[in-house]
Amino acid sequence: MFIITVVILSIVIMSTIFALRSPTIENVYEISVIVPDSSNNMWNRFESGVREAMDNENVIVNIVNTTGMETLADQKNLIDKEIRNGTDGLIVEFIASNDTEKVVDDIVSKTNLLLLNTKCAMYDIDLKQVDTVTLDDELIATTLTSQLFDQVGRDLRFKRVGILANNIDQYSMKRRLNTVEDILDHAGAKIDWIVSGSSSEMEEQLKFVDIPNYVIGLNSVSLDSGIDFAKKYTIPLYGIGGSDQNVNALDEGIIQSMLVPDAFVMGYNSVQLMVQRIKFPHERKEEIIDFFTINKENMFSKQNESILFPIGD
């Protein structure tokens, strides 16, 4: 009887050990997100998508606080910290596009990487291990100028335009800016000024610029910076955005038309694609995110409400 009891107990113990070691029990992967100005509410809709994907994929996602991150070196320090902490993958929007080659090489030698909103000026490196989730910057910039033309016509001779371009150290912003400049030039418009920098820097510069006929903002931060200026001088404001301030200004009629990237899908797909790479290494994938043209008249349609105010936002 004693021998039988010992045998049964041994079987139970071995079964328990096997269960604990069983490969069918999945690991909970940890993913880190490092984007500029992460505390800005322009990321709220992106974070909603991240949270839903996190629940569906059963992963942990850490959106790193990037307050005070002003240079690529600052960002690299945060990246290194996450790698030391054992992150399984990094979702990164670089604060600057130049000189990123070595940073990318270093990251992919240590963990998985997905580039967000980043078409870096790094054509000489192997991108096979780097997925991207991004906008088509030329398309969205072209569509933005079309919105202006739809309202004021295509002949902009003798018209002056001001452009707010936030961070021109990012390749994506340069693409938008160059596209808008080329189209406006062909339409005969005079570009009065191009203001860039942080939100506070742009607001300060706007105190000293000439008053144009139209203002264009090339991202959420740019639009935020131009709202008070446009309201003060009753200037039509157009742009690419989606922050809470942007949406309020659209509702008030300060922003005439706004192109809103589907940030929820961007967040969701970024996490989903990263999980796929962690589990099943694959050839490089690039996903292009849609955007929507929204104005005061259509902002509360069923589709546009879901873009501006996603569930859980």
Feature annotation, model-predicted:
Residues 2-17:
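Hydrophobic membrane-insertion alpha-helices, especially the h-region
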Residues 32-48, 53, 62-72, 95-97, ...:
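Extracytoplasmic "Venus flytrap"
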Residues 42-57, 140-144, 168-189, 266, ...:
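Short, solvent-exposed amphipathic alpha-helices that sit
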Residues 62-84, 192-210:
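Structural motif
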Residues 94-109, 113, 194-247:
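Hydrophobic alpha-helical
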Residues 99-139, 243-251:
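Flexible loop/hinge segments that line or gate small-molecule binding clefts
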Residues 131-158, 242, 246, 261-279:
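Hydrophobic alpha-helical segments within soluble ligand-binding/sensing domains
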Residues 265, 269-313:
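Hinge/cleft segment of the Venus flytrap/periplasmic-binding protein
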